[in-house]
Amino acid sequence: MSVEVTKLASGLTVVTDTMPHLETAALGVWAGVGGRDERPEEHGISHLIEHMAFKGTTRRSAREIVEEIEAVGGDLNAGTSTETTAYYARVMKADVPLALDVLSDILANPSFAPDELEREKNVIVQEIGASQDTPDDIVFEHLNELCYPDQPIGRSLLGTAKTLKRFDRDMLRHYLATHYRAPDMVVAAAGAVDHRHVVAEVAQRFASFDGGLAPKPQAATFGNGGGRVVHRDLEQAHLTLGLEGVPQADPSLFSLQVFTNALGGGMSSRLFQEVREKRG
């Protein structure tokens, strides 16, 4: 079987899917931390740290981080979600060690330079403004707030201008140290990779990550219902309906996913055919 899994002594998990016929590899680091791990005063810090990871380390400048990967024809990116933050790269097989070195460097040695931090805060404030000009974003932001009121899982990932203003280098370092723990991290690689080589590289380059456990996020509690209407000067109305689902480990989850696709998952779905095709 091409998929292999190894758990290091620190608790960090390494997963590979070897595809010998390929000449390239995709690899990344997934940390089990996201928006739902934030306290009210930390709202938006997970996403900010993801941005700041590319803004320089104690070994590389922001420019050197991207140039080292792009100089060998690769690309580098990241993303934050409610429950995870991912940092990933795609490179030729000979450059897998380089990619792992860069990924480990931006997480283990970020400089969080004050001037870069202030600049990136402003970038995210602009993101917030753009989101507020996008009806699709607005409607789901309000839906999440209603489904999970007064909970981190119900808040937007971007934070607010007020919370962003408070963040400084020490706050980012503390959050990184307490939430980016080896037992809650996975390094995954697929393509032209050798499992033993990847494990050896990861064991060396990610050795500085603490083996302790990160704080547990607040348990989610579904809201008591209700609705909200937000008026904007637009030509279309955007509607959402949220219902409580089942836990991820529930056996009926797969049936629910089939139902979701049948209802609105594609052009042949019930809602697509009824709303768009029949009613325009």
Where are these regions (language model features)?
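Short beta-strand-initiation
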Residues: 1, 224-227
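Short, Gly/Pro- and small/polar-rich lid/capping loops
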Residues: 1-10
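Charge-rich, well-structured scaffold segments of protease-associated domains
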Residues: 7, 15-18, 62-217, 229-230, ...
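Active/ligand-binding-proximal structured segments within catalytic/core domains
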Residues: 11, 18-69, 180, 251-263, ...
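Short proline/glycine- and acidic-rich turn/helix-capping motifs at secondary-structure junctions
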Residues: 217-225
